[in-house]
């Protein structure tokens, strides 16, 4: 199957190339695996995680190696599924909307492809950052595979480039794992590709540790992130959306910090998130009394002590507390106001908070988080996705999420580490907004940063 890909003139140099895909196939575990039904946790199967997320990795050629990345990854995938065998199964919905993996061993979808383009051409065209205009060709959406239930839990496509580099793209069912869990799986995949006989960190299921019966559930905190939905999402209002990536070096983070009191300790996540939240609110121009939310996706593994989770636990272990303020306050008050809200929200997460979320899911039917007026940020910089190394080709030029927004929620951004063509390191943030709002957002962002730098 040959497909012509043309990159938009607005974001690239007009580069176009063809992708030839082989027939899709199912990769099954290399050895027999248990046939069993494994329930997900109460964190896993909430409504807000019932979608699939694409990630993508670009690798430079190694002309001194004659290994074929397609075959290396395909074999490693079959080997990895012996240890991560639930990924080779299919998701079923039980009573009370409880999800469970039917470990059938049917396998994961795998596509082999070739593209008549070199990595250097993509790099020159600034096409190695999300949103990737050619994503649908490098991670083909196999018909019927994008549902959550009764479909393969992983979709993998490996595309050889004419320079002998390659692109590794993967789509995963979010109910099965989070960023930390995906990193564990991919590291295991790399270890097996490089000759190890077993993952150095054995995978652990143990989803019962984050599951509670409705009769024993005790909601001990207020969880405004799961308020009943009210109002209309100011982003998803039917207006055409445009996505764009922004690159923040240490220089930009320092410029943002000049807007804050010098004695106010803060992390780069807090400084950048407060700044983006404020700029985004200005760009969307909502009614001044509209409640605006900044949802922090917080990895909670370190919070759990009774009992602690084993290092190989690869299920979802995050909570999504929301900082909430009116649009008027976000826009009119100093940036310190937004930053302190974020700090307070982060500090509210304790082990009891995590247990309270599991109880809420069990008693309220696994509700959806609030989408209206919500900006969701997930920091992937600590998950080592930029270190996914299959051997001769080294670390990826880019490794991380493939688009701004997720599923039906455009108001989501991921922080991804990146080194640009100049060798400068920083954080890439992809943002999706209506066209007019994006223009305002860019003007506000640049205006504030330029003044602060000056």
UniProtKB/Swiss-Prot annotation:
Q: Which InterPro entries match?
A: CAT-like_dom_sf (IPR023213), Plant_acyltransferase (IPR050898)
Reaction it catalyzes? (3Z)-hex-3-en-1-ol + acetyl-CoA = (3Z)-hex-3-en-1-yl acetate + CoA
Q: Which residues form the active site?
A: 174, 389
Tissue-specific expression = Expressed in leaves and stems. Lower levels in flowers and barely detected in roots and siliques.
Q: By its UniProt entry, which Pfam families does this protein fall under?
A: Transferase
A GO molecular function annotation here is: acetyl CoA:(Z)-3-hexen-1-ol acetyltransferase activity
**What inducers act on this gene?**
Up-regulated by wounding with a peak 3 hours after wounding.
Sorted keywords for this record are: Acyltransferase, Transferase
Q: Which residues cross the membrane?
A: none
E.C. number: 2.3.1.195
Per the entry, what modulates this protein's activity?
Inhibited by magnesium, calcium, cobalt, zinc and copper.
Which Gene Ontology terms describe the biological processes this protein takes part in? green leaf volatile biosynthetic process
Q: What did gene disruption experiments reveal?
A: Loss of (3Z)-hex-3-en-1-yl acetate production.
Q: Kindly report, in one word, the top-level EC class recorded for this enzyme.
A: transferase
**What pH behaviour does activity show?**
Optimum pH is 7.1-7.3.
What task does this protein carry out?
A: Acyltransferase involved in the production of green leaf volatiles (GLVs). Uses acetyl-CoA as substrate, but not malonyl-CoA or benzoyl-CoA. Prefers primary, medium-chain-length, aliphatic alcohols.
Q: Which family does it belong to?
A: Belongs to the plant acyltransferase family.
Protein name (record): (Z)-3-hexen-1-ol acetyltransferase
Q: What organism, scientifically named, is this protein from?
A: Arabidopsis thaliana (Mouse-ear cress)
């Amino acid at each position: 199957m040959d497909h012509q890909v043309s990159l938009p003139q607005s974001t690239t140099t007009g580069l176009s190339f063809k992708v030839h895909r082989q027939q899709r196939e199912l990769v099954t575990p290399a050895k027999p695996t248990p046939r069993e039904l494994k329930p997900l946790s109460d964190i896993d199967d909430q409504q807000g995680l019932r979608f699939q997320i694409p990630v993508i990795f670009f690798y430079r050629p190694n002309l001194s190696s004659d290994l074929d990345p397609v075959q290396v990854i395909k074999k490693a995938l079959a080997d990895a599924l012996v240890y991560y065998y639930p990924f080779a199964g299919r998701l079923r919905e039980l009573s009370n909307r409880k999800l469970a993996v039917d470990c059938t061993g049917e396998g994961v979808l795998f596509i082999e492809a070739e593209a008549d383009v070199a990595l250097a051409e993509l790099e020159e065209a600034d096409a190695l950052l999300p949103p990737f205009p050619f994503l649908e060709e490098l991670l083909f959406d196999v018909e019927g595979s994008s549902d959550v239930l009764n479909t393969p839990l992983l979709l993998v496509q490996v595309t050889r480039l004419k320079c002998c580099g390659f692109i590794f793209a993967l789509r995963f069912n979010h109910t099965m794992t989070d960023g930390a869990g995906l990193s564990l799986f991919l590291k295991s995949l790399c270890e097996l590709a490089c000759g190890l006989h077993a993952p150095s960190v054995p995978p652990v299921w143990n989803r019962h540790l984050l599951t509670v019966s409705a009769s024993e559930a005790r909601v001990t905190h207020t969880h405004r992130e799961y308020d009943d939905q009210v109002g209309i999402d100011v982003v998803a209002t039917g207006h055409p959306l445009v996505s764009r990536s922004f690159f923040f070096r240490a220089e930009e983070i320092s410029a943002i910090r000049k807007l804050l009191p010098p004695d106010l300790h803060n992390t780069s996540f807090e400084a950048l998130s407060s700044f983006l939240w404020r700029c985004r609110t200005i760009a969307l121009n909502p009614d001044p009394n509209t409640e605006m939310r900044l949802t922090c996706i917080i990895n909670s593994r370190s919070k759990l002590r009774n009992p602690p989770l084993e290092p190989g636990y690869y299920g979802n272990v995050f909570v999504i507390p929301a900082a909430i303020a009116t649009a008027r306050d976000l826009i009119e008050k100093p940036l310190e106001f937004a930053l302190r809200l974020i700090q307070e929200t982060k500090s509210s997460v304790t082990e009891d908070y995590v247990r309270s979320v599991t109880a809420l899911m069990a008693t309220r039917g696994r509700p959806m988080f609030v989408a209206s007026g919500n900006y969701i940020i997930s920091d992937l910089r600590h998950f080592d996705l930029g270190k996914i190394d299959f051997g001769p080709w080294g670390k990826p030029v880019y490794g991380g999420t493939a688009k701004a927004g997720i599923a039906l929620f455009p108001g989501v951004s991921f922080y991804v580490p990146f080194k640009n063509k100049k060798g400068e390191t920083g954080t890439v943030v992809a943002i999706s907004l209506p066209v007019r709002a994006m223009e305002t957002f860019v003007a506000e962002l640049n205006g504030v940063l330029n003044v602060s730098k000056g």
